[in-house]
């Protein structure tokens, strides 16, 4: 049964005497740090020497320290740096300076779940993961609202890890919308699956395939772009607002009939079987192992495939058409 927690379930007072170090000042880092500070908590920012975010964090009113120094000063350490560098930074700048009773916080479980970070037994480990990009986490907080979040406890040395996690979630505004209890395993595996099979890998491959089929059949690339990529936002926005039902109530009956009859032919049982294979690769750690090795080898496959897609016809056509729609960036 799902457990959801709200403001009334969280005690911000548990953090009032704590020093919180937010490591990283990117999308989530800047939002979480500012929300915590505006909630009246003691927050410092930890960054690598020479970070381009150093001056930005200072201009936002934070005391900024090198990562290792921030860890030394903190009771609660939120690790908001990219997955692929977390393990190295942990070994060099976090682990040597951890003290008994500290709490390590994450917003994604990759490195804990796949054993790339193995903290000592005498610290708390929990996750608070807002389910929105950082700019929205910040904007909703400023509007007196919040975005939903996830909470997971991996290690409860203090006996209060869950309570500390809920307090942290309240500090960044998530308990206003609701915080769902999960595990590091569930968050990590479902997050990776969603990215690979649906949100990123699935969608980009579907869009490219549709575009290519139309162009190969002799249709103008610009028309193919509008039909297969540009209008995608309109449909996704409707689904975001009210699920499949609102989307289908908002499109023509012709479009809905095509949706119902043709959709299952495209995403058929073979596709679901492939999705199951992808999920098994995630669950077994095979994907994590490949990604870790790819980074150690300086990303040859990652860079080659990224470059290939950046030079795809759909990108060239898209740039030209987006230049005709200046309101997109308003």
UniProtKB/Swiss-Prot annotation:
Pathway(s) the chain acts in: Amino-acid biosynthesis; L-isoleucine biosynthesis; L-isoleucine from 2-oxobutanoate: step 2/4; Amino-acid biosynthesis; L-valine biosynthesis; L-valine from pyruvate: step 2/4
UniProt-recorded Gene Ontology molecular function terms: ketol-acid reductoisomerase activity; magnesium ion binding; NADP binding
Binding-site positions, Mg(2+) 1: 191, 195
Cofactor note: Binds 2 magnesium ions per subunit.
Cellular component terms (Gene Ontology): cytosol
Protein keywords: Amino-acid biosynthesis, Branched-chain amino acid biosynthesis, Magnesium, Metal-binding, NADP, Oxidoreductase
Biological process per Gene Ontology, one example term: L-valine biosynthetic process
Active site per the UniProt annotation: 108
Domain KARI C-terminal knotted: 183-328
SUPFAM superfamilies to which the protein is assigned, alphabetical: 6-phosphogluconate dehydrogenase C-terminal domain-like (SSF48179), NAD(P)-binding Rossmann-fold domains (SSF51735)
Enzyme's top EC category: oxidoreductase
Binding annotation for NADP(+): 25-28, 48, 51, 53, 83-86, 134
Keyword Acyltransferase found: no
Record-listed Mg(2+) 2 binding positions: 191, 227, 231
Keyword Metal-binding: yes
EC number: 1.1.1.86
Cofactors, names only: Mg(2+)
Residues that coordinate or bind substrate: 252
Chemical reaction(s) catalysed: (2R)-2,3-dihydroxy-3-methylbutanoate + NADP(+) = (2S)-2-acetolactate + NADPH + H(+); (2R,3R)-2,3-dihydroxy-3-methylpentanoate + NADP(+) = (S)-2-ethyl-2-hydroxy-3-oxobutanoate + NADPH + H(+)
Chain ranges of the KARI N-terminal Rossmann domain: 2-182
PANTHER family: KETOL-ACID REDUCTOISOMERASE, MITOCHONDRIAL
Function as written in the Swiss-Prot or TrEMBL entry: Involved in the biosynthesis of branched-chain amino acids (BCAA). Catalyzes an alkyl-migration followed by a ketol-acid reduction of (S)-2-acetolactate (S2AL) to yield (R)-2,3-dihydroxy-isovalerate. In the isomerase reaction, S2AL is rearranged via a Mg-dependent methyl migration to produce 3-hydroxy-3-methyl-2-ketobutyrate (HMKB). In the reductase reaction, this 2-ketoacid undergoes a metal-dependent reduction by NADPH to yield (R)-2,3-dihydroxy-isovalerate.
Family: Belongs to the ketol-acid reductoisomerase family.
The name this protein goes by in its record: Ketol-acid reductoisomerase (NADP(+))
Organism: Halothermothrix orenii (strain H 168 / OCM 544 / DSM 9562)
Gene name per UniProt: ilvC
């Amino acid at each position: 049964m799902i457990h959801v927690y709200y403001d009334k379930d969280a005690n911000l007072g548990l953090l009032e005497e704590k020093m919180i170090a937010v490591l990283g000042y990117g999308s989530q880092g800047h939002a979480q740090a500012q929300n915590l500070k505006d909630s009246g908590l003691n927050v410092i920012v930890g960054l690598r020497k020479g970070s381009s975010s150093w001056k930005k964090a200072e201009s936002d009113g934070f005391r900024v320290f090198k990562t290792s120094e921030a860890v030394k000063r903190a009771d609660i350490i939120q690790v908001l740096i990219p997955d692929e560098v977390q393990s190295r930074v942990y070994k060099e700048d976090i682990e040597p300076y951890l003290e008994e009773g500290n709490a390590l916080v994450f917003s994604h479980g990759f490195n804990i779940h796949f054993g790339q970070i193995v903290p000592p037994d005498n610290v708390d480990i929990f996750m608070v993961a807002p389910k929105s990009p950082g700019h929205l986490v910040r904007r909703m907080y400023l509007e007196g609202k919040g975005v939903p979040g996830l909470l997971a406890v991996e290690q409860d040395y203090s006996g209060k890890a869950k309570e500390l996690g809920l307090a942290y979630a309240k500090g960044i505004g998530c308990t206003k919308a609701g915080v769902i209890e999960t595990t590091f395993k569930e968050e990590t595996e479902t997050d990776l699956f969603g990215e690979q099979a649906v949100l990123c890998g699935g969608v980009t491959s579907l869009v490219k395939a549709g575009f290519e089929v139309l162009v190969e059949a002799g249709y103008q690339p610009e028309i193919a772009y509008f039909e297969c990529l540009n209008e995608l936002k309109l449909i996704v926005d409707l689904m975001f607002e009210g699920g499949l039902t609102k989307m289908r109530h908002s499109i023509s009956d012709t479009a809905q009939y095509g949706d119902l009859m043709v959709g299952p032919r495209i995403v058929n049982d073979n596709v679901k079987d492939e999705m199951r294979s992808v999920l098994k690769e995630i669950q077994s750690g095979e994907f994590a192992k490949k990604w870790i090795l790819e980074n150690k080898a300086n990303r040859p496959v990652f860079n080659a495939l990224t470059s290939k897609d950046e030079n795809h016809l759909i990108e060239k056509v898209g740039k030209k058409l987006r230049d005709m729609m200046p309101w997109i960036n308003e």
